[in-house]
């Protein structure tokens, strides 16, 4: 058949197109869900970044609380990412306040209302649907600054 692309090649092209390199910035860690470790936002990367954040919060937070607030948007990957994030935080001894579906401002406010030592927002905002992100908050419900994020 003329013009036919073998399924293997087509699948490889789709995967390559959908596997975007992780983006680490002041607003968090963003990437496409799945794919190779270190290149995308897959469960192992989520555990790695969540545990690094938890270690940072434990070392730097001025709040006596052991609570971390977790909120997420309605992306299809949200429940999976939430389970990995919450499980990692609980495994590290934190009390997770899972507020479920919530906007970024709602999650930011929940951090201060709960007297939490930090928060994680699971959202990729304006990025395409195959993306997701971990947006990291301090005890004031503010995004980590560049210096904090680099730690």
Whereabouts are the PLM-identified features?
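Ser/Thr-rich, low-complexity intrinsically disordered segments
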Residues: 3-17
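Generic hydrophobic-segment detector
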Residues: 1, 17-21, 61, 123, ...
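Glycine-rich phosphate-binding loop plus the immediately following alpha-helix
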Residues: 141-151
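Ferredoxin-reductase
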Residues: 62-142
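Alpha-helical scaffold segments in soluble metabolic enzymes
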Residues: 48, 52-55, 106-109, 151
